[in-house]
Design a protein with these regions (language model features):
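Short linear clamp-binding motif
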Residues: 2-16
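Short glycine-rich, basic-tinged beta-strand/loop micro-motifs
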Residues: 18, 50-74
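Intrinsically disordered, low-complexity serine/threonine-rich segments
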Residues: 71, 81, 109-110
Length: 114
């Protein structure tokens, strides 16, 4: 499902406190699981911390992030390929500086159906 920028921002900003997912969207869960696999592999090779949010029934969206030490120079073709695949899998990618590191956050939106 293609999402435009407005849809992505709305999906992330609108937190429905009453939301209770009752059915996972299989393709979204598959994307999330692949993101976790890639993050774990990158984290292991680069010794970079990473985190994967849990698939919670009350959260429509989930994310995986990796914290790269600055400056970031990635020469390894395999790592670059994994990052490119993560960008392709995610509905939204956010880059931010967090405590002297580059955090790449890969968000999967609408993981649950109500």
């Amino acid at each position: 499902m293609e999402m435009n920028i407005g849809d992505m921002v709305a999906a992330m900003a609108a937190r429905n406190e009453a939301f209770r997912g009752n059915e996972q969207v299989p393709e979204k869960v598959e994307a999330y699981n692949k993101l976790k696999e890639h993050a774990a592999a990158i984290g292991k090779v680069l010794r970079a911390p990473w985190y994967a949010d849990d698939l919670e029934l009350w959260e429509q969206n989930t994310f995986v992030y990796i914290d790269f030490p600055l400056p970031v120079n990635i020469l390894n073709d395999s790592i670059r390929g994994r990052i490119a695949e993560m960008v392709r899998l995610a509905d939204m990618v956010t880059l931010a500086e967090v405590r002297g590191r580059l955090r790449m956050t890969f968000t999967v939106a609408r993981v649950w159906k109500e």
